[in-house]
Amino acid sequence: MKRKVSEFSYGFVLTHELVNAYGYFRTDAPHGSRGGRKKGAEDGAGAAPRGYPLFLQFKASEYMKRRNAGESKLVGLPYFRFALHRKTQSNQHQLLIELEKKGYAVFYATPKIHEAVNLNSAFFDRQVVASSLFVNPGEIGELPDNRPHRVVFSGRSEDVYVCSKPQRLGGVIHGAVFAEAVRRAVAEKEAQSLDDEFFNRLAGDMVSLISPNRRIFDELSGGKVEMSASTFANYLAKTLFDCELLIVPS
């Protein structure tokens, strides 16, 4: 079935809610706001802000309601699904797994909403997070072959599967408990001081997964003279990983 909610519109409303309702920090802000300041700089409270990086890749979900829908036996009708890129199309999924292995919080985020009018209602009622599903790429694991693979789920059940060969996924996060689940996960890590040194290190980690050649990082860095370190990290997250980079406050 044709998608009625685009990744662009969903990504905007989800990010807006995480920032304005949950207090997450943006990393594409102008100089001097929240993320990205000189090492040792302090905020108005007298201490440099601290937090944890969060990578979100937005996935538009297909709404399946016909009786011949292939995965209906798993979760019933209607249901949602989103596709993972084949290996020959993109190494995107593997890159996200490698990013997760470096200790960063990484999720696919997808809506349990298929009509634009429902997305609008969720946006104004601040229910976008609650109407979403979050899946760790590492939970899905490496794709075993070049066949089409999809994540299948329903708005009425907590069961989530990865197909083509159906396998139930554990550890997925349904939106209503997302903020608390992320808070528990990052509580096990040391909060990072959100200064230029941190964002430059984060940028280096991202580039190293694309190419171990330091020259690539230097070339990318050459054009960021008028860009804060946090904005540059956000730029790399978007261009190299197709992700939104946010900061979960400590």
Each predicted region: which residue ranges?
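Acidic-basic catalytic patches of nuclease active cores, encompassing PD-(D/E)XK
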Residues: 1-33, 99-102
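Active-site metal-binding core of divalent-cation-utilizing nuclease and nuclease-like domains
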Residues: 28-40, 48-49
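Glycine-centered small-residue hotspots that permit tight backbone geometry or close packing
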Residues: 40-42, 213
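Short, surface-exposed beta-edge/turn micro-motifs
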Residues: 42, 52, 103-107
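Conserved catalytic cores of phosphodiester-cleaving nucleases, focusing on short active-site segments
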Residues: 44-45, 54-62
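Catalytic cores of nucleic-acid endonucleases
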Residues: 60-124
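Extended, basic/helix-rich recognition subdomains
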Residues: 123-250
